[in-house]
């Protein structure tokens, strides 16, 4: 099969995944409006409104104190404006309760890739410019240090799907702040021609956001600046502890109660991510990287049950790294 035919088929799979009426998958697919795993009553979860000078507005942050070090949990492409997807779809606050680690969940940022954009999204007439990297690495850490006694250094960041690559990029360019970075089903080679087009389609579907306002045309340097595979050397040089998970698609017992259409969507999306993860692994090894765990199971889909499972799997490593 030629590369062109394969690319056309994979892009078709992405389009199919985007229009399937999924109710439990997230990231580059359709995520639920209704929550089913909010934090139980009694957990010390706070809802903070943190003013972002760079974006000219308050950003909601879900926060659970637990120690001076924190893990930042980033959301997927269809991030909602009321709660973070990790709280909506998993028991992440419960898992980290009394772990000695604080939990920081920024809310919002649909289609943002948690990056600093060039300008407001033109297609949906966005009224301000996303400046998520600035918020996460300057404004929020300052607020948390002042008000919640969270260290500005030696923390962790974990992302899924859209934010998997963002987590690695944040760690690559801000190594003092993040000594641990995890990517779950992330898109780790976004500057390839195929992925630039796939991301364009996905962002149009998720809120009519314009990728041109984010990183410009495909040849703009911002694409490579925000490509974890290109930046693998920086992660190696910093000695950042990494956890990388991605499956090739295909159902497992986790999907037993999942609608067939939803499972197809999730499988298609996961299969899109795996090539970029393998490319990152190769670049990381070529740069001399020896401080990463790579988890590539034989099957698995692009959905919250898998990401919740992997967050629990990496938890011990994360805590040991932050407390080390």
What spans do the regions from the language model cover?
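Residue-level signal for alpha-helical transmembrane segments in multi-pass membrane proteins
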Residues: 22-26
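Non-catalytic cap/lid and distal C-terminal segments of serine-dependent acyl enzymes
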Residues: 12, 16, 27-324
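N-terminal export and membrane-targeting signals
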Residues: 1-21, 34
């Amino acid at each position: 099969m030629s590369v062109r035919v394969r690319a056309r088929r994979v892009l078709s799979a992405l389009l199919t995944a985007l229009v399937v009426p999924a109710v439990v998958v997230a990231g580059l697919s359709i995520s639920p409006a209704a929550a089913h795993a909010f934090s139980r009553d009694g957990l010390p979860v706070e809802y903070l409104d943190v003013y972002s000078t760079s974006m000219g507005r308050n950003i909601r942050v879900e926060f659970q104190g637990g120690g001076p070090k924190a893990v930042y949990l980033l959301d997927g492409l269809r991030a909602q404006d009321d709660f973070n997807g990790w709280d909506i779809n998993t028991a992440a606050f419960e898992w980290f309760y009394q772990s000695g680690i604080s939990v920081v969940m920024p809310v919002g940022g649909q289609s943002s890739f948690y990056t600093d954009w060039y300008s407001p999204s033109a297609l949906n007439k966005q009224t301000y410019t996303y400046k998520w990297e600035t918020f996460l690495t300057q404004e929020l850490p300052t607020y948390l240090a002042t008000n919640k006694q969270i260290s500005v250094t030696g923390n962790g960041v974990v992302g899924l799907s859209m934010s998997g690559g963002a987590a690695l990029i944040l760690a690559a360019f801000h190594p003092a702040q993040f000594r641990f970075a995890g990517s779950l089903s992330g898109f780790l080679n976004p500057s390839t021609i195929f992925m630039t087009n796939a991301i364009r389609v996905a962002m149009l579907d998720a809120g009519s956001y314009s990728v041109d306002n984010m990183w410009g045309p495909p040849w703009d340097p911002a694409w490579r600046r925000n490509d974890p595979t290109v930046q693998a050397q920086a992660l190696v040089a910093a000695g950042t502890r990494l956890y990388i998970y991605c499956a090739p698609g295909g159902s497992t017992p986790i999907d037993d109660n999942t609608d067939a259409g939803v499972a197809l969507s999730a499988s298609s999306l996961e299969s899109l991510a795996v090539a970029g993860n393998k490319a990152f692994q190769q670049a990381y090894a070529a740069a001399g990287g020896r401080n990463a765990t790579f988890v590539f199971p034989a099957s698995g889909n692009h959905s919250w049950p898998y990401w919740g499972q992997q967050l629990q799997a990496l938890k011990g490593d994360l805590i040991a790294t932050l407390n080390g």
